[in-house]
Amino acid sequence: MKIVIADDHAVVRTGFSMILNYQEDMEVVATAADGVEAYQKVLEHRPDVLILDLSMPPGESGLIATSKISESFPDTKILILTMFDDEEYLFHVLKSGAKGYILKNSPDEQLILAVRTVYQGETYVDMKLTTSLVNEFVNQSQTDEVSSSSDPFKILSKRELEILPLIAKGYGNKDIAEKLFVSVKTVEAHKTHIMTKLNLKSKPELVEYALKKKLLEF
């Protein structure tokens, strides 16, 4: 099987490549350092499996890349690399098209098993993350049942519409302030208004919302 590895740390790309290339049925055909490059490598090589770091540089997050790549290349199975502090993102990435999750500090044998599992079209989730994932699924299902049919997106101001995709892409308040020539306090105020108006509770929910509204493009 052909594999592409996307991670912003060179040591991870190199280490995982060595482990997987040692397997007779696996070949790492390319690596990438961010979401944009990952998309380009998948377009070029059409791999069977993409191993994708969830925590990517600002503007090219793993959550955004997962949605874009799974939509454009449904035959490429996406295996997410994650850390414990990324647990809140797991349910959202699953909804975006990922086939599995594995912790970066997992043993080599577990990585190999995860790759083979998603390659076969099955879902692989690290046991340490399963409870968190199930709880998030239950909470999200309950939220969906009581969600309003009205669209609060229409009441966002022009400035809030500018700031929303930047927040979703991972830019910090200072970076956004510099881009839009406003103060950091202004950005913080707009961010609060956006979260309140859209009834969003976390950054992953905001990213998912931005993806649904097609506000994020490579």
Swiss-Prot record:
Subcellular location: Cytoplasm
Residues of the HTH luxR-type domain: 149-214
Modifications made to the protein after synthesis: Phosphorylated by NreB.
Gene Ontology MF: a single term: DNA binding
Response regulatory domain ranges (all copies): 2-119
CDD domains: LuxR_C_like, REC_NarL-like
Positions of the DNA-binding region: 173-192
Modification sites for 4-aspartylphosphate: 53
Gene Ontology, cellular component aspect: cytoplasm
Signal peptide: none
Coiled-coil region: none
This protein's UniProt keywords: Activator, Cytoplasm, DNA-binding, Phosphoprotein, Transcription, Transcription regulation, Two-component regulatory system
BP GO annotations: phosphorelay signal transduction system; regulation of DNA-templated transcription
Annotated function: Member of the two-component regulatory system NreB/NreC involved in the control of dissimilatory nitrate/nitrite reduction in response to oxygen. Phosphorylated NreC binds to a GC-rich palindromic sequence at the promoters of the nitrate (narGHJI) and nitrite (nir) reductase operons, as well as the putative nitrate transporter gene narT, and activates their expression.
Protein name stated in the entry: Oxygen regulatory protein NreC
Lineage: Bacteria, Bacillati, Bacillota, Bacilli, Bacillales
